[in-house]
């Protein structure tokens, strides 16, 4: 699994460059209670606006799909503006959960 995450992180650095702030692994892989049907959940935090995210999200999803085909494991990236995430992290249960259980991988 670490190979997938590292390869995905490397690809994202190429796609997003300095706009990539952080990649957080969360969910069953972060908790270490995954099984064969588990996907790799990743929160991708960027310094891009929502409009700019829409322009690059297909590249990110294509990258995830290529790695899914290579490794046979589903990758589920969510791309959010870092400021948006930080603003809501103490309010929204989903973001609180990522903050609590997540592992920063890049």
PLM features: residue spans?
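Catalytic core of pol beta-like nucleotidyltransferases
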Residues: 1-19, 31-36, 47-106
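Short gly/ser-rich loop at a beta-strand->alpha-helix junction or flexible surface loop bordering the NTP-binding
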Residues: 21-29
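Short beta-strand->loop micro-motif that forms the acidic, two-metal-ion catalytic signature
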Residues: 41-45
């Amino acid at each position: 699994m670490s190979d997938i995450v590292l390869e995905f992180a490397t690809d994202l650095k190429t796609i997003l460059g300095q706009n990539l702030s952080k990649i957080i692994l969360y969910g069953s892989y972060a908790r270490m209670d995954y099984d064969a049907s588990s996907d790799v959940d990743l929160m991708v935090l960027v310094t891009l606006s929502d409009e700019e995210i829409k322009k690059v999200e297909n590249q990110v999803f294509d990258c995830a799909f290529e790695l899914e085909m290579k490794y046979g494991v589903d990758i589920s990236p969510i791309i959010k503006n870092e400021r948006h995430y930080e603003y809501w992290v103490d309010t929204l249960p989903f973001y609180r959960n990522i903050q609590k259980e997540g592992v920063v991988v890049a």
